Amino acid sequence: MPLHKSAEKRLRQSARRNERNRARKKELKVLLKTVQKLVDTNADKKEVEAAYRSAIQKLDRLGVKRYIHPNKASRKKSQLSRMLNNYMKAE
């Protein structure tokens, strides 16, 4: 339990930021799983590309703003690109 007023404020700020960060990471996880599910179910190419684009945008945004490490964002983008390319070749 914080003993000082400033420590209480930092605790409140930290809790708010933690919640916000978790929500952003959850959104990213949902987008990545959506792309994976669409590829697995052989969905329409346009639908897969749209989901892919939104996932890439989210990865870029979170990497630049340091919600996730930029290298992790880059790695995930690369994995998604490979997945999409293999999917497009197969069809």
From Swiss-Prot:
Keyword Transport: no
GO cellular component term, pick one: cytosol
GO biological process, one term: translation
Record region (Disordered): 1-25, 70-91
Tree of life domain: Bacteria
Gene3D superfamilies on file: Ribosomal protein S20 (1.20.58.110)
Extent of Basic residues compositional bias: 70-79
Biased composition range(s): Basic and acidic residues: 1-21
GO MF term list: small ribosomal subunit rRNA binding; structural constituent of ribosome
Key word Transmembrane helix present: no
Keyword terms: Ribonucleoprotein, Ribosomal protein, RNA-binding, rRNA-binding
NCBIfam families assigned: S20
Family designation: Belongs to the bacterial ribosomal protein bS20 family.
Function: Binds directly to 16S ribosomal RNA.
Protein name: Small ribosomal subunit protein bS20
Taxonomic classification: Bacteria, Pseudomonadati, Chlorobiota, Chlorobiia, Chlorobiales
